[in-house]
């Protein structure tokens, strides 16, 4: 990726068959490389990568191949409808902005790790612009018109099943509203607190608003675990999704695998841990499917040895976690850092019905 930047001046956005397609949203190289760096994989030129990230994050839109609609995002904190796509049916402004928020949060994490305090503060603040899109009336994120008003009329279910919907790409407002992995607590406050957050998230699953066949809402099941006492909902929903949509039949995944994303979701979920925020080295835990999994790590980066994930689960009906240990010590949290995992190395789950 860094070589691509050296060759033509930009990080890849959606490279396919050795060519850039400019498909989809965001600035994805930032969270990918930041994630690697913060997990200890540092055999590359991080300063050159940072140079590339700053270019895409600060270059004016007319000269910015990575973020062509950056100007209003920087000036207002959001991207209004019609700024980049005059045809409303092809406008993906909210989706674009959400990806930029995630990328900017990752850039803030990297800047902090590199000792660039001013950059870290700037990009963290930019990553919180999602709040502009939240509509109390609909209880969802909502596209914003050029004059700053919310799109009206508005149905948060529009856009489901890949139908056209102003503001959102391949999904509805429900598929995107909880896509704030870097500020879950902030989103909870917007929604009226933890209870309201959980109820609204459960509403998505109970009313068929979650789309298991595409990526925007792929991490939704793991958000329940961000509220103490509600972790069982994560365990229940993940188990139900694995059972219903991931099988050994020819159509064994619910949608396009998209470079392995759906398969990766299934594998991580089956192992019992899921990377819940791009660019932040953390995992949310859930009930594993396997009795034992060994992750062989490169001793160059992880000299303490491999990771072993084990469980006493003997029946599919044992959906819920009773207790967990990491490195032989009791775990009291359902979210652990990459460092805690690689240093503890032995993660064990005791489960129950």
Residue ranges and their predicted role:
Residues 17-23:
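Membrane helical hairpin/interfacial module
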Residues 326-329:
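Short strand-turn-strand beta-turns centered on an Asx-Gly dipeptide
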Residues 332-338:
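Short, solvent-exposed S/T- and G/P-enriched segments that are highly enriched in secreted/extracellular
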Residues 317-323:
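Beta-strand-rich binding/interaction modules
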């Amino acid at each position: 990726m860094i070589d691509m930047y050296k060759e033509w001046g930009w990080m890849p956005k959606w490279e396919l068959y050795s060519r850039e397609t400019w498909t989809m949203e965001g600035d994805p190289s930032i969270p990918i490389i930041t994630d690697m760096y913060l997990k200890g994989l540092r055999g590359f030129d991080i300063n050159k990568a940072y140079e590339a990230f700053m270019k895409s994050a600060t270059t004016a839109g007319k000269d910015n191949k990575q973020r062509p609609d950056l100007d209003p995002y920087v000036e207002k904190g959001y991207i209004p409808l019609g700024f980049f796509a005059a045809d409303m049916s092809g406008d993906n402004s909210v989706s674009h902005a959400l990806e930029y928020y995630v990328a900017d949060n990752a850039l803030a994490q990297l800047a902090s790790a590199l000792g660039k305090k001013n950059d870290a503060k700037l990009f963290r603040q930019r990553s919180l612009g999602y709040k502009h899109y939240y509509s109390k009336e609909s209880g969802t994120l909502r596209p914003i018109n050029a004059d700053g008003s919310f799109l009206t009329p508005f149905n948060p279910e529009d856009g489901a099943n890949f139908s056209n919907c102003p503001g959102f790409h391949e999904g509805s407002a429900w598929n995107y509203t909880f896509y704030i992995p870097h500020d879950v607590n902030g989103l909870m406050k917007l929604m009226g607190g933890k209870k309201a957050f959980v109820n609204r998230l459960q509403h998505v699953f109970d009313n068929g608003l979650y789309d298991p066949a595409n990526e925007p809402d792929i991490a939704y099941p793991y958000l329940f675990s961000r509220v103490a006492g509600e972790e069982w909902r994560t365990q229940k929903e993940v188990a139900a999704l694995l059972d219903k949509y991931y099988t050994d039949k020819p159509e064994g995944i619910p949608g396009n695998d998209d470079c392995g994303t759906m398969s990766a979701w299934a594998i991580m979920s089956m192992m019992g841990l899921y990377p819940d925020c791009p660019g932040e080295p953390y995992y949310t835990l859930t009930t594993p499917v396997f009795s034992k999994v060994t992750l062989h790590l490169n001793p160059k980066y992880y000299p303490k040895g491999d990771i072993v994930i084990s469980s006493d689960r003997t029946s599919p009906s044992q959906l819920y976690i009773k207790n967990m240990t990491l490195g032989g010590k009791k775990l009291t949290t359902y979210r652990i850092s990459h460092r805690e995992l690689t240093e503890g190395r032995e993660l064990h789950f005791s489960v129950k019905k």
